[in-house]
Amino acid sequence: MASKSKPSHSHDHHQWDSREYVSKWAAGQDPKEKDREAAFRVLADTIPFERNAPIRILDLGAGYGALTGFLLDRFPRATAVCQDGSQEMAKLGSERMEKFAGRFEYVLCDFAQKGWQHRLQGSFAAVVSSIAIHNVRAPKLIEAIYHDIYPLVESGGCFLNFDRPRPPWEDQMAWLRAAGFTRVKIFWRGENRAVFGGFRDK
């Protein structure tokens, strides 16, 4: 695990290097847990592996582990790598996911910085993200991130993103197809949020 990195969320107004800010922000997200449950459930059901499969998951911009924890609960033999740029968020996530100790680790790096993917080892059955990538706020950079993600997905695996339409979902899905993903579509749509992504064919 890396010990020092620039925050992957440095492209917006959040203060992810502040323990107090991170704790207050996470507490503000807790009431939204029920709202995102439907999206998380669809995302989990879309991962093309049996529940008892010993899959490896990568959560991009994992934050305090809301999605990671949901998936580790749904896939009891899975392990996860939580990528995030905030050391304070990683500390909070490690505390909140204590019951999954030994099944996850944090890697601190900035997915908006070139070469971020080289900080990760191996490939993943599922690469996922939740309300994170839109924070980059640079369409060309988001397109490049999707190209970086593709080699991280193992044959037969998937990339699934629960995020806002910034940039528009149609543009993002076109970038996923250009990166090599197949069967790209929106799997769930809510108010100003959707689960979309694609698969890496065997």
Q: Where is each model-derived feature located?
A:
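A short glycine-rich, Lys/Arg-flanked "PGG" loop and its adjoining helix->strand segment in the class I
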Residues: 143-155
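Short alpha-helix
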Residues: 167-179
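A short acidic, Gly/Pro-enriched loop at the edge of an enzyme's catalytic core
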Residues: 117-127
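Class I SAM-dependent methyltransferase SAM/SAH-binding core
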Residues: 56-58, 64-114
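Conserved beta-strand signature within the Rossmann-like core of class I S-adenosyl-L-methionine
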Residues: 156-163
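Core SAM-dependent methyltransferase catalytic element
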Residues: 185-202
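A short SAM/SAH-binding and catalytic strip from SAM-dependent methyltransferases
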Residues: 125-140
